[in-house]
Structures are given as structure tokens and as C-alpha cells.
């Protein structure tokens, strides 16, 4: 079946390319105001350079697309065509600052059409508009002072997770376990679902959604895009069932108005006094669950990878975490004060996020014609900023491939150079939430085990986040009591 689709897709792409060839070249945007367009090529008609953009990630080198063109054109801004759209790629801290500082002035958020199709809004608004609504709703929930009450809960979930998934096992595959851990926390914190069977039922379709969100938007059976659309419908139906039950529980006094984001959404009206419908809430919870577990699960997986490869770094994390263990009474849960003591551990996690950023970059759209660095950017062009353009740039981070947590001592890296959570008004509101679940994971991991990689040279693929090709199998060595 898969072999059948290869020639079929090739013919489909060829037909589309030829059909639109004339239209594409007649409608190419031109420079204005006397400034040239950025240097670069737009690749094949319609397809553009989408394949090169995606395939370098599939091969484990997402930065290659960026750095090859930066070198070729001797420029921090270059043009391309991705997902059928003319685009400019902005590279470096100065470019990041420009884009982040001009959010909703010169640029606005943009997602490929595949995102809107995987996450269709029940209110007929775009994913961009839905995200704006969510960002207005979430800040209070994700403030550090609000998240403090969830630290003990995360600690309990982590303890249960390691007892059931790691202990008494010689080998484990890390990435699926990390996904289970972060998804379990997201389900509990966002919708108060914690029954393992119910969590597992929701988790299964999420892998397909994550793989298909940023993919070639061909909706044919067997494609990642088709699988993502089907899986999102399955999850949405399950979430509507959870929402209906919560409404009943709230009415009967069995649920609290402040217990989680779901209750907050059900009981909060907009400026006109209108409450969100069940489908609308399901859409938003679906997006939260994706964002609330995917990036952290990738980060936790790479923490395990790097600590296996760097015994001296492991030892530093172990010593710090054991000091916290020794300060606790038997059965006492982690508190905010304990998290604040995990300074070296968080430096290590930040270095992991620098070298393997779950968010490789993000798109913006030009709201009007503007110029930057002597180049004209036409209205409607898509703009892409890249984390790797600063994270592994030797001008920003000396010896960029060296793992060095001390980069984050003191004031840390230069502004706009370390961007695993984005920046500006669109910085991920769940940054502090992710910090907590990563540190709690590290605490439980190192106090229980040392480990080694089963596949020393395991390949890394990026689709759309970095993931070890085999899920990172490791051999566990429990600490002696």
C-alpha cells in the first residue's frame, strides 16, 4: 500500500507543479521602495523548498537548511518558499529582537494551513484567533504563584510514574515514558483526569497529531496529515464527553470552580457575557494538551540522553538533588522552596534546551510592507525565526556544540539568543509550568538511577520536534539503598 502511494504522490505533485507554474511566476512579489528582496531561491513552483526544509530535520540536522543558506548568501535574512508561501527566514539575536518586538505591529502569528485543518475551530475562527483568546485566559493560571500549588501534585505523579514505568526494569525506552509522564500531568492539571486507563486512552492518538501537524498537507489515507486529522477528531470527541460530565459535576457540587482550567473555561464568559460552547472548549483543551506535554517530553528525553553521555554533569545534578532528598522527611512532597534550590539542574536543563530545542522556530506574517537590514519584506510574506540560528552559533555561544551548563550562570546568555520558548508577547505562557515538570522529572530520575544508552550513536530526527529515532532505550542501574 505504501509503495502504491509513492508514484501516486509523485504524479500529484508533478500535476500541481505544472498546473500552477505560470500562475506562480506571474504572481511573484517584487521589491518596493527601491530596496531589493532578500537573497535566496524559492525552489520549485508551489512546493518551494518545503522538502529541503522538512527533510533536513528528518535526517537529524534541522540547522543545515538555515546555516547553508546563511553561508551561501552571506546574510542573516534570506528568502525561500515553504508550505506554498513566499517566506523570509530571519536568523540571529537581532532578527529575533526585531520580530518579537514588532508583534501585532509589523508582524502577527501565522501557522501553515495544515495546523488549521488538524485543529479546525468549532467557532469558524482561525487557529491564530483562537490562540489570542487562549493567551488572554492563561496568564493567571501559569503565574509562578499559581503553579506552586501543583508542585506536590507533580511530585506524586512523578513518583507513581517511576514506580510503575521504570522500577524493577533492566531497560526502558525513554521517549514514550516521558510522553506518558508529561501527558499525565497535563491531564490532571488541565482537566483533572488522572485515572491511568483514561489517560492512556487519550494519549494514544496524540503521537499521530504531533507527527502530522507540520507535514505536507496531503489528506490521503496513510499520510501523517490524514492520520493527524483523524486522531484530532477522536480526541475532540473524548474531550467533549469529559466536558459534559464536568458540567454535571459542577451543577451537583461535585467539582470545584477553581480546580483546573476546564472549570475556569466553563464558568468564564467573554466581554458580551457569552460562555464558550463544548466544542470550543474541546478545541482549546486539545491545543493545551498538545503544547503542555509535547515540548516537555522532548526536553525530558534529551535530559536523559545528555546525562547518560556526560557522567560529570550527571554527578553535579545528582549531588544537588540528593541534598534536597536529605532535607525532606519520609513521604514529604516537594515544595516551591525545593524547586528554587535546583539551580544547577535547571542550568543543565537549559543547556539541553539550547542544544535540542523542542521549538525549532515559528512563523510570523508581515502585516504591511517593511524594510529590514536593507531588504524589502512585502505584506503577506511569511517570516520564520530559527532557534538554531543563535543556539548553535559560535558568535553567540563559544564552542556551541560543547555541553556547558555554566553558560546560564549569572545573567546568562545575551538577550534574544536563547529562545526555546519563543519571545516577546508570544513567549510560551507555559514556560514556568514546563520548568516545574522538567525539574520534578530530573529529581525522581537521578535519585533512583544511573543509566547508559543501549544504542550509543542513536540517530536524532526532527518531526517537528527532536526525537531519538528509536525512542532512546537505556539500561538502568538502580542506586543501592
Curated annotation (Swiss-Prot):
Q: What is its main location?
A: membrane
Gene this chain is encoded by: CYP716A52v2
Organism, by scientific name, is Panax ginseng
Q: What does this protein do?
A: Component of the oleanane-type triterpene saponins (e.g. ginsenosides or panaxosides) biosynthetic pathway.
| Subcellular location field | Membrane
Q: What is the protein's name according to its record?
A: Beta-amyrin 28-monooxygenase
* Membrane topology, as annotated: Single-pass membrane protein
Question: Which superkingdom heads the taxonomic lineage of this protein's source?
Answer: Eukaryota
| Entry keyword annotation includes Iron | yes
| Pathway participation | Secondary metabolite biosynthesis; terpenoid biosynthesis
Amino acid at each position: 500500500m505504501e509503495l502504491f502511494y509513492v508514484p501516486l504522490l509523485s504524479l500529484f505533485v508533478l500535476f500541481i507543479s505544472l498546473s500552477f507554474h505560470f500562475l506562480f511566476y506571474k504572481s511573484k512579489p517584487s521589491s518596493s521602495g527601491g530596496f531589493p528582496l532578500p537573497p535566496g531561491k524559492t525552489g520549485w513552483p508551489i512546493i518551494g523548498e518545503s522538502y529541503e526544509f522538512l527533510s533536513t530535520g528528518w535526517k537529524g540536522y534541522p540547522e543545515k537548511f538555515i546555516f547553508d543558506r546563511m553561508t551561501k548568501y552571506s546574510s542573516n535574512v534570506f528568502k525561500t518558499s515553504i508550505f506554498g508561501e513566499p517566506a523570509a527566514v530571519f536568523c540571529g539575536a537581532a532578527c529575533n529582537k526585531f520580530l518579537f518586538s514588532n508583534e501585532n505591529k509589523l508582524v502577527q502569528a501565522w501557522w501553515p494551513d495544515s495546523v488549521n485543518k488538524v485543529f479546525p475551530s468549532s467557532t469558524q475562527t482561525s487557529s491564530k484567533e483562537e490562540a489570542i483568546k487562549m493567551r488572554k485566559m492563561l496568564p493567571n493560571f501559569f503565574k509562578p504563584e499559581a503553579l506552586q500549588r501543583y508542585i506536590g501534585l507533580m511530585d506524586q505523579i512523578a513518583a507513581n510514574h517511576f514506580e510503575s514505568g521504570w522500577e524493577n526494569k533492566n531497560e526502558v525506552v525513554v521517549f514514550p515514558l516521558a510522553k506518558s509522564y508529561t501527558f499525565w500531568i497535563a491531564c490532571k492539571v488541565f482537566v483533572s483526569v488522572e485515572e491511568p486507563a483514561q489517560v492512556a486512552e487519550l494519549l494514544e492518538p496524540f503521537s499521530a497529531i504531533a507527527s502530522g501537524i507540520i507535514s505536507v498537507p496531503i489528506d490521503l489515507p496513510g499520510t501523517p496529515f490524514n492520520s493527524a486529522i483523524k486522531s484530532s477528531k477522536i480526541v475532540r470527541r473524548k474531550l467533549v464527553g469529559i466536558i459534559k460530565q464536568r458540567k454535571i459535576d459542577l451543577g451537583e457540587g461535585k467539582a470545584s470552580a477553581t480546580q483546573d482550567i476546564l472549570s475556569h473555561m466553563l464558568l468564564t464568559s467573554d466581554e458580551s457575557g457569552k460562555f464558550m460552547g463544548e466544542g470550543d472548549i474541546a478545541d482549546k483543551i486539545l491545543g493545551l494538551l498538545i503544547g503542555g506535554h509535547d515540548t516537555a517530553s522532548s526536553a525530558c528525553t534529551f535530559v536523559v540522553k545528555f546525562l547518560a553521555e556526560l557522567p560529570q554533569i550527571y554527578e553535579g545534578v545528582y549531588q544537588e538533588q540528593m541534598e534536597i532528598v536529605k532535607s525532606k522527611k519520609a513521604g514529604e512532597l516537594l515544595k516551591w522552596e525545593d524547586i528554587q534550590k535546583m539551580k544547577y539542574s535547571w542550568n543543565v536543563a537549559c543547556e539541553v534546551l539550547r542544544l535540542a530545542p523542542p521549538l525549532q522556530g515559528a512563523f510570523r506574517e508581515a502585516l504591511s510592507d517593511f524594510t529590514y537590514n536593507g531588504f524589502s519584506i512585502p505584506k503577506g510574506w511569511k517570516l520564520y525565526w530559527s532557534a538554531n540560528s543563535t543556539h548553535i552559533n559560535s558568535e553567540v555561544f563559544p564552542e556551541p556544540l560543547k555541553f556547558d551548563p555554566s553558560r546560564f550562570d549569572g545573567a546568562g546568555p545575551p538577550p534574544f539568543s536563547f529562545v526555546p520558548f519563543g519571545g516577546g508577547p508570544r513567549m510560551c505562557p507555559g514556560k514556568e509550568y514546563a520548568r516545574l515538570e522538567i525539574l520534578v522529572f530530573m529529581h525522581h530520575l537521578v535519585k533512583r538511577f544511573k543509566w547508559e544508552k543501549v544504542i550509543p550513536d542513536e540517530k536524532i530526527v526532527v518531526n517537528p520536534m527532536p526525537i531519538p529515532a528509536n525512542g532512546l532505550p537505556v539500561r538502568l542501574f538502580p542506586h543501592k539503598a
